[in-house]
A protein has these predicted regions:
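Solvent-exposed interaction patches of small proteins and small membrane subunits
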Residues: 1-96
Length: 96
């Protein structure tokens, strides 16, 4: 993963962290449950976006970039079938 991708993920996670703190504060202050659920939904969506960005980076650097210039330095040698299986596993982890 390149430096810009790491920075982008870190920024997104910092936002999620702030949203979680906001959720805790809302619960502590006894806010209206529907408002808390709305914030919870937004937090979950933000975390899903982190997962999508990370999966995209993995596909770009470890699957599509396998054996090329963009390959991640920790990518394992894989055959064509293993690359397809890696993509299947990546997608299944994202949609769980």
């Amino acid at each position: 993963m390149d430096v810009e991708s790491r920075k982008s993920l870190d920024r997104r996670l910092a936002r999620v962290e702030g949203q979680v703190r906001g959720l805790r504060r809302m619960i502590e202050q006894g806010e209206y449950c529907c408002d808390i659920l709305t914030q919870l939904s937004a937090t979950r969506s933000a975390l899903d976006q982190v997962g999508a960005e990370l999966a995209t980076s993995h596909v770009r650097t470890c699957i599509v970039g396998h054996g090329g210039e963009t390959e991640h330095d920790k990518a394992k040698p894989m055959s064509g079938d293993e690359l397809i299986e890696e993509l299947r596993v990546t997608l299944s982890r994202l949609v769980r």
